[in-house]
């Protein structure tokens, strides 16, 4: 329970005042532009609907839980239905992608008229058996900078590596070692709090599943932050097809120069 309350307070889920404090008082990163406020509100609301736990597995069962039990299509409303409690067990990219979809649904519902089309939602919803590098979910689930490449391709946000620019609510791909690709040790998360020498993030974590975790930054070799700034661009999801480079990360390792090029980041 304490884990859940820490997460809620850090992301400002209790009230707008807490939100403003947490998003601007970390001492690291810039204030939230007014145009992005509605996205952060949707993200906080979406995150509040996840229960802690459920177990962590990178298994067929976890993939089926995401694609067949948690993500449904309502033929009557012609809109998606996300049953978050059905998405167990889970793994890091399934947790973050489901949070992205739920937040996008909340954001879209708050607009004067729907922005994300039926065709776009059908492209965004994961399919069981979808391969890495195929379609939006296949991109987001790929090794390396999968989600960063998806967001860059859609023009839905920005990617960067500088801790000083990061703020709560940014997606954060952690690399525990220098390896990127076939033998990488990575973890897709959402930044909750930058505590200086340590960092708190939300994801599906070993062994418990959904929840927040705090680790020393000294354990982290590198990070890629992804910030959603234009959620309306997810309406372009049907244009996301196959990405051979992302698919190849199951078989090869790559360097940061390639990662930055595909993610729209500049080399330092």
Regions found by a protein language model. Name each.
Residues 1-4:
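Positively charged n-region of N-terminal signal peptides that target proteins for export
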Residues 101-109, 175-177, 230-233:
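Short regulatory "switch" loops immediately downstream of catalytic or recognition motifs
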Residues 7-16:
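Bacterial N-terminal signal peptides
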Residues 84-89, 184-189, 245-247:
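Glycine-rich, flexible loop segments associated with nucleotide phosphate handling
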Residues 18-20:
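Boundary at the C-terminal end of the N-terminal hydrophobic targeting segment
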Residues 199-268:
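Low-complexity, Gly/Ser/Thr/Pro-rich intrinsically disordered linker/tail segments
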